[in-house]
């Protein structure tokens, strides 16, 4: 039996109507006025009137004071992300196969040409978002990676974010945030190279800009507030479980944190600990986590582990931790999550920053049908085919007959023409021509 010991008071809202109106107006203005409109929004919204595209000299100057230890940590994380992305790249194989005597088909796997990577800057400096996008695109073999981040508190791109962009391999770095950044990358403003794919997290306006431009460019995911679910049984450490719930709640006021458990004792202890841990956070994180846990936190008690799987797959959380015995069983049975973190040793924060798999993940139930950002997002699987004249004997006849059944006479005649050319003295059953 499934019961709620704590139920969310709200459902995350992104104020979609408001965001749509604002974004529609901004995109129209940027399309009409180009760079001038972008500069206007940069000054109006971010207090930035400096250079948009940073030169190599500017990048060196602005990152020269980044401590060696910080550089080493960022470099380590980039290697982790790159190594995982390269392993993903190797899983994509090109092949050719003879499907019928004389009919050969295959696939090629190629990177897109231009990618735009966005890293937000608001409450926090999102260093990890900088290398998650850029390093993965570079591992895919993308020739041109354009990176954007908001001027941090009106002072230009945060030096640590800027270093992360550079170290991960960004070819162009622009001091732009929000809708104007997404539009500039999509339209190729300042670079002359419109992006094929735009990726990266952001607020509701960034998410709406990506949604609005989808089709003109590819995107990673339709992202909402960050989510975490923790599955825990009686073997779990309540203090660690509570810490991990709070660790994700600090993302923002609308970030859900869910506990699914078969242990009432563990649930009670976690619910007692969470407010204590939140109270000890710095002010910015404390305010966000307090609202997130109060309004969106849930604790769900299940009678069996099968019920836990049922509820977990229904929620399809962005991040899913498992603090239980028999981790292999959970790996085999859970099917809907953005990324899975098995065992107490594997906290979401490790995946958010350092471990290797990408942290740009589906939210709001989208993990039921999609995965997160990966090297695959930057790759195209292109098919090809070739056949001999002899192979067209059967292929041509079947094609003509099906085409005429569909009423597509011009299609059928492309087969007729070849059969007449290649086998002038032969007779074939090509179907009944469509009446003119």
UniProtKB/Swiss-Prot annotation:
Classification via Gene3D superfamilies: 1.20.5.1300, Nitrogenase molybdenum iron protein domain
Q: Which cofactor does it need?
A: Zn(2+)
The active-site annotation reads 318-319
What family does the entry list?
Answer: Belongs to the histidinol dehydrogenase family. HpsN subfamily.
- Which GO biological-process labels does this protein carry? L-histidine biosynthetic process
Q: Which organism was this protein described from? A: Cupriavidus pinatubonensis (strain JMP 134 / LMG 1197) (Cupriavidus necator (strain JMP 134))
Can you name this protein? Sulfopropanediol 3-dehydrogenase
Q: Which residues take part in binding Zn(2+)?
A: 248, 251, 352, 411
**What Pfam families does this protein's entry cite?**
Histidinol_dh (PF00815)
- CC terms in the record's Gene Ontology section: cytosol
């Amino acid at each position: 039996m499934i019961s709620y010991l704590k139920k969310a008071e709200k459902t995350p809202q992104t104020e979609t109507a408001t965001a749509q109106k604002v974004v529609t107006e901004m995109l129209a203005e940027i399309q009409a006025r180009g760079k001038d409109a972008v500069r206007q929004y940069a000054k109006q919204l971010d207090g930035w009137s400096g250079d948009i595209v940073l030169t190599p000299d500017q990048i060196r100057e602005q990152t020269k004071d980044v401590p060696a230890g910080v550089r080493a940590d960022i470099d380590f994380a980039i290697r982790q992300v790159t190594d995982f992305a390269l392993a993903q790249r190797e899983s994509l194989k090109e092949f050719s196969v003879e499907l019928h005597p004389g009919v050969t088909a295959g696939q090629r796997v190629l990177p897109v040409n231009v990618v735009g990577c966005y890293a937000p800057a608001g409450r926090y400096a999102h260093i990890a978002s900088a290398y998650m996008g850029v390093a993965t695109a570079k591992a895919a073999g993308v020739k041109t990676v354009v990176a954007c981040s908001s001027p941090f508190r009106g002072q230009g791109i945060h030096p640590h974010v800027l270093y992360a962009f550079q170290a991960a391999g960004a070819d162009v770095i622009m001091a732009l945030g929000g809708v104007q950044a997404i539009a500039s990358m999509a339209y190729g403003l300042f670079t002359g190279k419109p992006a094929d794919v735009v990726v990266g997290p952001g607020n509701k306006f960034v998410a709406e800009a990506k949604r609005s431009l989808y089709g003109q460019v590819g995107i990673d995911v339709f992202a909402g507030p960050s989510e975490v679910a923790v599955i825990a049984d009686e073997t779990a450490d309540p203090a660690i479980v509570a810490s991990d719930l709070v660790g994700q709640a600090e993302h923002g006021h609308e970030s859900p944190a869910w506990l699914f458990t078969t242990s009432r004792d563990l649930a009670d202890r976690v619910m007692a600990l969470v407010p204590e841990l939140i109270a000890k956070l710095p002010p910015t994180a404390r305010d966000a986590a307090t609202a997130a846990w109060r309004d969106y936190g849930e604790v769900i008690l299940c009678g069996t582990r099968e019920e836990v799987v049922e509820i977990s797959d229904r929620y399809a959380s962005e991040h899913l931790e498992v603090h239980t015995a028999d981790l292999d069983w959970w790996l085999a049975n859970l099917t809907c999550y953005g990324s899975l973190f098995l065992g107490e040793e594997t906290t979401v924060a490790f995946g958010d920053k350092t471990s290797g798999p990408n942290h740009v993940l589906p939210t709001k139930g989208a993990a039921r049908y999609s995965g997160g950002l990966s090297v695959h997002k930057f790759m195209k699987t292109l098919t090809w085919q070739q056949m001999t004249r002899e192979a067209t004997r059967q292929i041509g006849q079947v094609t003509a007959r099906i085409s005429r059944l569909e009423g597509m006479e011009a299609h059928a005649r492309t087969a007729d023409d070849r059969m007449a050319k290649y086998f002038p003295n032969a007779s074939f059953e090509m179907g009944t021509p469509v009446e003119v």
